[in-house]
C-alpha cells in the first residue's frame, strides 16, 4: 500500500460512512518540508486499512510527521 495525500484519504473516508481516522503507527518521523514528500512511499498492507496519509504535527521538539489511516475497524 502507498501513502496518499490527505485530500485523497478524506475522499475515501467520505465514501465509507463506517470508516474512521486512526493512527497508522506510534512512530514519529522527521519533517521533510511537506506532506507530499511522503506521498507514494510504500507502507505495510494491513487488512481493514483503506488508506494511509501523512499528517504534520508539532511538539516541543519541533515539527514531525505522523502517519494516519482510514480504517473500517
Which role does the model predict for each range below?
Residues 5:
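Short loop/edge segments at beta-strand edges and connector loops
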Residues 15-73:
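Acidic, low-complexity, intrinsically disordered interaction modules
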Amino acid at each position: 500500500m502507498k501513502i496518499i495525500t490527505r485530500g485523497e484519504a478524506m475522499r475515501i473516508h467520505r465514501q465509507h460512512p463506517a470508516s474512521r481516522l486512526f493512527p497508522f503507527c506510534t512512530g514519529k518521523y522527521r519533517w521533510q518540508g511537506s506532506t507530499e514528500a511522503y506521498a507514494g512511499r510504500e507502507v505495510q498492507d494491513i487488512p481493514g486499512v483503506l488508506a494511509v496519509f501523512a499528517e504534520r504535527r508539532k511538539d516541543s521538539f519541533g515539527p514531525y510527521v505522523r502517519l494516519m489511516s482510514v480504517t473500517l475497524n
